[in-house]
Structures are given as C-alpha cells and as structure tokens.
C-alpha cells in the first residue's frame, strides 16, 4: 500500500544513452536501438493520495534515413490496481501531442501533463487491465484511462 505517492506506477523504455556513443544505424554497434521491457505482472496495488497518473510507455522515433523505429513495452498485466487521487487543485495543461521523452532521465514528471487522470499508456504490445479502480480528483475532467498505440 502506498500513501501520498507521486506516481503509483511508472514503466518507461526510452533511448537514454548513458555511454555517450554516437547514434548510428550500424548493425551490432549501437545500444541506442536495444533494450526491452516485457512480461510484467503487477497486482494487488493500493495507493491513496496519489498525485500524477500512472505512465507506461515505450518509444517511437526514426533512423537517420527516416525509417520508423518502434520499441514497445510488451505483455503488461495490471490486476487488482486501486488508486485514489489526492483532492487538491488540478492545474493541467495537456499538449496536443505528448513528446516521446527519448533521451532524458526516465522519471514520471518528465512527461509533463498527459491526457489521462489515472493510467496513460503508449507504445504497448499486450496490455491487460483487470479489476482497475481509479478515483480521480473531483476537479479533473480528463479520461481516467488513455491508450495510445496500444496493440
């Protein structure tokens, strides 16, 4: 059980390159396109007085030649997930497009405001949500769950 937590759940696959290697498309040389987050089961979560939505995200970008690159978080199962948000004023400024946040340190507040009040998921292959109970702030009029590029 969590009390006064900022972000109840944060799963982020991005391209943070801590080795400072130059980005290249050369096979076998670049850690940039690597990495995976997959086969996750999270259950029996209780959070009260939460501040920001849970965020689950992979990434999408393009190679130097413009070829799209998509790295999804795969096979995530949330079960028995209960979150109640803190009743304080909500000052939300959701951009038309949420940036990918590819290079910075992966932390929930780096994404800024998103268009969900409870769970925001993007670039996910295989997301199962069971027994989800989210109570947003009374003043928050965003949808509780938003899925973008979730297959």
Residue map of PLM features:
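Extracellular/periplasmic carbohydrate-active domains that bind, remodel
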Residues: 1-151
């Amino acid at each position: 059980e969590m009390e006064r937590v900022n972000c109840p759940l944060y799963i982020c696959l991005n391209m943070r390159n801590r080795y400072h290697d130059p980005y290249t498309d050369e096979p076998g040389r670049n850690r940039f396109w690597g990495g995976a987050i997959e086969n996750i089961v999270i259950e029996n979560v209780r959070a009260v007085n939460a501040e920001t939505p849970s965020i689950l995200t992979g990434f999408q970008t393009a190679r130097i030649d413009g070829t799209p690159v998509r790295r999804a978080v795969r096979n995530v199962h949330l079960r028995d997930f209960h979150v109640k948000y803190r009743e304080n004023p909500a000052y939300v400024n959701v951009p038309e497009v949420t940036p990918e946040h590819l290079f910075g340190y992966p932390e929930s507040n780096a994404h800024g405001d998103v268009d969900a009040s409870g769970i925001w998921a993007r670039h996910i292959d295989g997301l199962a949500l069971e027994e989800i109970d989210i109570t947003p702030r009374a003043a928050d009029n965003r949808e509780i769950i938003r899925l973008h590029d979730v297959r």
